[in-house]
Amino acid sequence: EHLALAHGAQATAMYAVTTALLRYPMAMAAGADMAPMLAQVDAERVEAARALFARSVDRQRMGWREVSGQPLLDVATQALYHDLLVLGQRATDDTRDVDVPPDFVSAVIIGSGRPTLVVPHIAKAPTKLDRVLVAWKPTPESARAVTGALPLLRQASQVTVVAFDEGDVAATEAGIVGYLQQHGVQAGFRREVALAHDVGTQLLSLAADEQSDLLVMGCYGHGRAREWALGGVSRTVIDSMTLPVLMSH
């Protein structure tokens, strides 16, 4: 809501979950009399979500949309009609969250291709995104993430671009810093040597050292059939982030 207000944007909250019938398919084997009970579970959960929404936001400033059944497809599809998607990080040890698939966040990012702001579950999101770290690679994923983040970058007081072992450093710096400058963003640049064991952890540590409020990066992954596989850096950041991350595939 605060982000939308800062940019004069319209925000919509979306309730998208797997139905109780799909979450507990074995219940139907017990008999048709389970159907009303499962429907009641769904009704109670959506009512709780509506109440939370009403308590948490100004309903004059934020819309509300409900879908159920296929949360991955529903959210990825609706993201196509919005400039930015905001998702909450899922705790890797949270066994209670059965409303969406375990790979919900990564699958929606990859499946929609839209800029997505992922908010960490262990920290309160800052009210202002003043200090931004951009993890740059000369790839379509990075380019889309930077383009999607431009409205936020223009309002930031400090933007730092970091590149890890990207060949011709001078050309890389001139390219990305020049692009940002053309869009009204003054950015610093630094090159880091990638550590072999885990660039994702290295990137998050750098964000902490820089006291960054936001990390911008491409999301790397591929899909086969209905399963999505994330690249190592993307998975580490999604699993271990402690600051908001704007990603795009």
For every predicted segment, state its role:
Residues 47, 51-59, 95-120, 181-190:
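P-loop/Walker A phosphate-binding loop and immediately adjacent motor/lid segment at beta-alpha junctions
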Residues 12, 18-21, 54-85, 183-215, ...:
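Structural beta-alpha unit
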Residues 1, 106, 147, 204, ...:
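Active-site phosphate/pyrophosphate- and oxyanion-stabilizing loops and adjacent acidic/basic residues
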Residues 1-33, 111, 124, 128-193, ...:
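Small/aliphatic-rich secondary-structure junction motif
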